[in-house]
Amino acid sequence: MSSGKIVQIIGAVVDAEFPRESLPKIYDALRVDEVGLVLEVQQQLGDGVVRCIAMGSTDGVRRGVTVTNTGAPISVPVGTETLGRIMNVLGDPIDEKGPIGEKERWGIHRKAPSYQDQAAANELLETGIKVIDLICPFAKGGKVGLFGGAGVGKTVNMMELIRNIAIEHSGYSVFAGVGERTREGNDFYHEMKESNVLDKVSLVYGQMNEPPGNRLRVALTGLTIAEKFRDEGRDVLLFIDNIYRYTLAGTEVSALLGRMPSAVGYQPNLAEEMGILQERITSTKTGSITSIQAVYVPADDLTDPSPATTFAHLDATVVLSRQIAELGIYPAVDPLDSTSRQLDPLVIGHEHYETTRRVQSTLQRYKELRDIIAILGMDELSENDKLIVSRARKIQRFLSQPFFVAEVFTGSPGKYVPLKDTIAGFKGIVDGDYDDVPEQAFYMVGSIDEALEKAKRLAA
């Protein structure tokens, strides 16, 4: 193990000088034992000097301090010992429960599985959330993105999916909190504990208050733990909240390293950085990784380079809309903007496919008629259009659903709706079976039977 000296410190960027014959490689981890800091090599500047990003605060670090090259990238604990534990980017426990006691450590920089090792995902994953199961069904071993601006419910949707899938699914889950609020991480830990699923979840946190190096690498730490479970032949769930903060940390690091910014100030290698992470999140013939990623959309602009780069890698996109949230319809999923590769009659069956397309065309027609209604009123519409508007408003309300994780705030118990009940309910609405039922009966209920019961109560 070679050692060198620190020659310059500018915030999170540290330059270290090594003997020329033992220059550290890119991504090698360097240790500053005096302050217990780890650095990751990002650039070789020549003349034996390497430029590093600090994986922690550089307070107390000064010029001339000795740095040791570990000769390998950052490595983290993997395996079942990580379950029920909270770790940071370096794999150190931060839950005050003592050492992890791992039998194996893996480097966080790994190659993506080769083409011949990868497996296609066609098996449906039921979530119990009507709008998702109907409009943008998830595949087991697929990649899903939850897109939304500030405060439209990405994290709540993510928590509900974790609750529904992780509790119903008996496999292991990994949660990577990338640059999100510490409070949310704390709430999530306690929620898992109360649901008795903590012993099946590994938690990796690099929250908002951490230096950019931690936030950039914490997603790779979580992914490495998930890859180990996958390579043991398991079906793993990987939750990442939030991919945008991963991009943002990359932007900060890129600026600190002096790279020229590209569009909207993002790093010039945005697509490559996103690809490095996303290409590793994949299923192999041994096991599967089903990943659900929250993606913050800056200023509600889906064409921003960060969300736009993420779209290309996903199998299903769930777009949360502020307009729908303003109507009080939660989950605020936009049924006309959300898509899934699984939406194919050969995968989901003809009944599901036909129902989804009819629901979407009804909502699309309602969207077109809204301007006419706003100017001329409902009376100017043809009888057929009036019927479409009435059904579309019922569909819109029936797409809402009370969540288990929001019980504390709403006071109404959460609902898990099986896929067959979801299809039957929406098919009935578009077929006109419930034309005589008032639209408010469809709001915030589970299955169609609950809507009919609510209608009876409203009529009484």
Swiss-Prot record:
UniProt EC number: 7.1.2.2
Membrane topology qualifier: Peripheral membrane protein
Subcellular location: Cell inner membrane
Keyword Translocase: yes
GO molecular function ontology, one term from the record: ATP hydrolysis activity
InterPro entries given in the database record: AAA+_ATPase (IPR003593), ATP-synt_VA_C (IPR055190), ATP_synth_F1_bsu (IPR005722), ATPase_a/bsu_AS (IPR020003), ATPase_alpha/beta_chains (IPR050053), ATPase_F1/V1/A1_a/bsu_N (IPR004100), ATPase_F1/V1/A1_a/bsu_N_sf (IPR036121), ATPase_F1/V1/A1_a/bsu_nucl-bd (IPR000194)
Matching CDD domains: ATP-synt_F1_beta_C, ATP-synt_F1_beta_N, F1-ATPase_beta_CD
Residues binding ATP: 148-155
Reactions catalysed, as given in the entry: ATP + H2O + 4 H(+)(in) = ADP + phosphate + 5 H(+)(out)
Broadest EC class assigned to this enzyme: translocase
GO cellular component terms attached to this protein's record: plasma membrane; proton-transporting ATP synthase complex
Assigned keywords, A-Z: ATP synthesis, ATP-binding, Cell inner membrane, Cell membrane, CF(1), Hydrogen ion transport, Ion transport, Membrane, Nucleotide-binding, Translocase, Transport
Function: Produces ATP from ADP in the presence of a proton gradient across the membrane. The catalytic sites are hosted primarily by the beta subunits.
Assembly: F-type ATPases have 2 components, CF(1) - the catalytic core - and CF(0) - the membrane proton channel. CF(1) has five subunits: alpha(3), beta(3), gamma(1), delta(1), epsilon(1). CF(0) has three main subunits: a(1), b(2) and c(9-12). The alpha and beta chains form an alternating ring which encloses part of the gamma chain. CF(1) is attached to CF(0) by a central stalk formed by the gamma and epsilon chains, while a peripheral stalk is formed by the delta and b chains.
Family statement drawn from the similarity comment of this UniProt entry: Belongs to the ATPase alpha/beta chains family.
NCBIfam families registered for this protein in UniProt: atpD
Protein name: ATP synthase subunit beta
Source species: Methylococcus capsulatus (strain ATCC 33009 / NCIMB 11132 / Bath)
Name of the coding gene: atpD
